[in-house]
């Protein structure tokens, strides 16, 4: 087992001899790297990155931010590989003390799905994660949202017009003459600007096929607060790494693809509550991420936080031809419904994590063809619904009752093909032709329910991914058939699906913003799995959100995913093994919580710079997971207890040791709970395979 001689060595950091810059957490992420450090009295800091053939490349000053006494840099646009970051203090205009991280492993984004069909790469970045040649990068903050400018081509002769504000710049792009790739980088908490269109940023590129636009956030705290994003008449658009909350626009959606869009990729965003709308189903806001009249779309690695209506797909297309979309590796975290709710489209829905969903998972209507592949369902009430048949009309008993049931849609049905999905907990699901199936998690015979499952079914389940759905399988209402788009090589793209369990672990680790974002919330599964009501403490916290201070956002102590810590809690047999794999962490990876936290966290900086005991200073994190050594280190004074709990709530380990060996745990995602002096801290970790 590797040993660490200093706290900084365990963190994967090295300080230059005699330097005053004290580094905290640093790591690689998806095509980005980050570092935090304590202020040493410098006026500012320059940051340089090296790696992948580059040496001492200075990053933009806007990427270096100060949060109280803590500084942070996030460096986007890095190709997958190994890098170091060098932090240099600047005093009176002169560079001085510096510190350099150890090697940070940067991973590539998963560019899979229909948005990448036909050789397209949406946005201002190349397929390798670096900016496209000639790309213009503009930084948008709360103070610059109305004043940022860009000279944009606004005529066929190349006449340039100086356009002001981020919406003003996009309005100039609408004329369709500007071909320069544009990257709008949002920094921090940004509220409504003066130039929004009915409360939304509108990306309308005038149907140009040569404009490439990325709208992204920098770091874990980039937040769109109070306004939404609307996309129409646009191609080659990417939206990523944004937290979107408290939307109060006229349209009401966090992000909405409205019409005439192609090759759009929305990924790694956090979707929170919006303001309540006028309809009774809009108490949590309207749609989180909706799409209609658009094709060649990918929505991936997004985190949906208790949204009421997550993904409406389709509205008035009127045809089943030519509309293609992919949903993969999204975390439907206690969101209620529409994951997605599909009209007309051919939709590939794979490797998503359905985590405690009170109403339903995916739903198919109006002749849509939905391929549900290797998704993980935990306590999702109705994992799959086909309108006007199966569970949709039998949900309340043994009599087919489309009048009183059929609340999902009342529209004619489509068809769902299902392969490799995992179900657990309380759920109801009726496969095509099944003699028995699960009702609220209990095996039930079709005969006892009086159901002909060749007519009334939720999905057609196959044993091989490439099995075609025969044309004899039709929806009960509308006699619609599956179009087998997923086995048509002229339509389908190349991709690699994880098994369902591995997908869940990857989703938990990577969905949402960098490091999971700055806003943290832990749901109470015993309440929130079955509830579609507004979580009022969560709502209050979102309304009160004013931006990040460099520390974690605390979770109320009443919220917890953990099982009881009493001796009666179930304990897993640690001798069992698993063949599933998880996304590996860097060998220098560490996750920590401070003594002021009560949630899973964004790692904070450590003020330690020499070989000291973690418990010797209250400034050091109270709990630290060192992935390379597969151990926890506890740094609180006095007595304490540590519980390690699986994602399903099973406690697998309890300890009062200051160093807790986790090498005996099988690979997977765990929640660690530290209880001391009447307070509780939580940390979510990924334990990789040996």
Per-segment meaning from a language model:
Residues 42-63:
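Extracellular low-complexity, O-glycosylation-prone stalks/linkers
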Residues 574-576, 584-586, 590-690:
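C-terminal outer-membrane/trafficking sorting elements
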Residues 163-180, 195-214, 223-240, 246-261:
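Extracellular beta-strand-rich solenoid/capping regions of secreted or surface-exposed proteins
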Residues 109-120, 127, 134-138, 143-145, ...:
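Long, ordered, amphipathic alpha-helical scaffolds
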Residues 19-42, 95-108:
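Pro/Thr/Ser/Gly-rich low-complexity, intrinsically disordered linker/stalk tracts
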Residues 196-203, 225-229, 248-258, 278-291, ...:
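Extracellular beta-strand/beta-solenoid scaffold signature
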Residues 211-221, 235-246, 261-277, 287-288, ...:
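Right-handed parallel beta-helix
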Residues 75-94:
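Beta-strand-rich modules
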